[in-house]
Structure formats: C-alpha cells, structure tokens
A protein has these predicted regions:
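A charged N-terminal "starter" segment
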Residues: 1-138
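Generic structural signal for well-ordered alpha-helices
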Residues: 58, 62-69, 92, 111, ...
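Acidic (Asp/Glu)-rich catalytic clusters
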Residues: 66-76, 95-97, 115-117, 136-145, ...
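Structural preference for beta-strand elements that scaffold enzyme active sites
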Residues: 78-80, 102, 120-122, 147-149, ...
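Glycine- and other small-residue-rich loops at beta-strand/loop junctions that grip anionic moieties
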Residues: 80-81, 103, 125, 150-153, ...
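Active-site beta-loop-alpha junctions enriched in small/polar residues
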Residues: 86-88, 108, 126-128, 151-157, ...
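Internal, well-ordered alpha/beta segment that forms a basic, Gly-enriched binding/recognition surface
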Residues: 150-172, 176, 183-184, 194
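Active-site loop/helix belt of alpha/beta enzymes
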Residues: 181-247
Length: 247
C-alpha cells in the first residue's frame, strides 16, 4: 500500500477556494479566498461572526493529537480516525501527520471531500449503490496513489463490486474487508461460516483483494458497563478468528 497518507499540494489548493457572500457565519460582502480568513482580524467576542460558532484552540488540538499518537504507539495499534464529524481536510492532515494510518469515512461524498489530500480512506459502509461504486472507482482510476478500502457482507455485493471493477479497468485490485455483524443489527455477516463464504468469494474474484475483516462494536453497548466491557474486549477476537481460518 502507498506509504504517504497525505498530499500537501492537494490540501494547499483549498486555500484558493473562493467563499461567497452568504457563506454561513462569515461577514463578507465580496468573494474571499479561504486562505485569507486568518488575516481578517475577526474576533468572535466582538460578534464579528454570526452565532453559534465553534472555536478550536490550537494548544488543545496539539495536545489531543500528541496524546492519541502516544496512546497508539504505547499499545501497538494503528488508527484511522473517523472524519465524518469534522469533515475538515486540514484536520485530517493534522491527524495523518501525527501517525494516523488513514481516515475513516461513512459516505462517498465524504470520500470525495477527503481526497483533498488524503491518500488512504476506509469507507466504513457497504459499497452497493451503482452510483456510489462508479464514483469510488472513478476516484481510484483518476489518482493511482489514492487508496479506498471498502466493505462487503454478501455474495451479491462481491459480485457487484467485481463486475464494476472489471468494467472500470483499474490498474490495481480493490481492497475489500468482510464486515462482521450481529444478529438483528444493521449490517454484517451474522455467522463465521457466512463471513468465510464472503471472504472466499472476494479472494477468488478478479480485481478484488481480500484485505481482512472488520466490525462495529458500538452496537454491543447496553447499560451494563461490566458486560459491555467484556463484550467489546471480545469482539476483536471474532475478526482475528475469522482471519486465522483464511490462512
């Protein structure tokens, strides 16, 4: 996989984006370069911007970035923080610059925003809609250094991805994670056998690459903290167990 998770030149292009009058919160009467916001001298305490307004304190941001980097190093884990809350390529760059492996996102439009510099995205959702598949493959074909790891939990989904990749003529295989799910919940393979069936289909499909297994432990949480901790601690073992069956 590509070793550079971020492209500073693509991020710099955002500085040239023109903000138009009517942009929420900004007191501008003429178009303004986004990169010029910092020299306008605006002060929220003087009500120069409309409310509500969110402020980021750089010292706190640097502290949080450093703390999370050291936490991951101490525990020997890699992190792809979820970007759907901030939707800020500048913050994505700061996270990647502090050791993040990539950025997690939930929708294809979010992936399109992240491509302003982000080189590696985990799309933590089923990629099944034809328009979404077409958009992701177009991004990959346009930029050979861009990586997008997607999910699948069904044979039908694998077939759809494989057919689309073949039609697109990608130079590299599309990495796919098998999603592990929970009975009665929103997505994912319900059993180990189902997960292994999907995994074998991915591994045997031209144009696809079996990248591993993943799941969302948040759906395990109840109001019983002790039981929740046990369940969440055990959940990664399911993914590891599925992976060992594939060796």
């Amino acid at each position: 996989m590509h070793t550079l998770p971020h492209d500073g030149l693509a991020l710099a292009s955002l500085e040239e984006h023109l903000l138009q009058p009517g942009t929420k919160g900004l007191p501008i009467l003429e178009p303004l370069r986004q990169g010029a916001i910092g020299v306008q001298g605006w002060n929220v305490l003087n009500a120069d911007t409309s409310f509500p307004v969110a402020l980021l304190k750089m010292s706190s941001l640097r502290h949080n970035l450093d703390w999370m980097r050291r936490f991951c190093e101490r525990h020997g884990v890699t992190l792809a923080p979820h970007g759907k809350t901030t939707m800020s390529p500048q913050l994505f760059a700061a996270q990647l610059g502090n050791g993040a492996w990539g950025i997690t996102l939930a929708t294809v439009p979010q992936v399109q925003v992240a491509q302003r510099g982000v080189r590696r995205v985990l799309l933590a959702n089923q990629l099944v809609a034809p328009a979404d598949i077409k958009a992701v493959l177009a991004l990959l074909k346009r930029d050979p250094h861009f990586e997008c790891i997607v999910l699948s939990d069904s044979l039908a989904g694998v077939v759809r991805l494989a057919e689309a990749v073949a039609a697109a003529g990608l130079a590299s295989p599309l990495p796919v994670l098998v999603e592990l799910g929970l009975s009665g919940k929103r997505a994912g393979c319900r059993t180990l056998d189902a997960a292994l069936t999907v995994a074998r289909a991915i591994a045997g499909a031209p144009g696809l690459l079996l990248a591993g297994f993943e799941g969302y432990e948040g759906l395990l949480v109840t109001d019983d903290r002790t039981a929740d901790l046990r369940a969440v601690d055990a959940f990664p073992g399911a993914a590891g167990g599925a992976g060992r069956h594939c060796r």
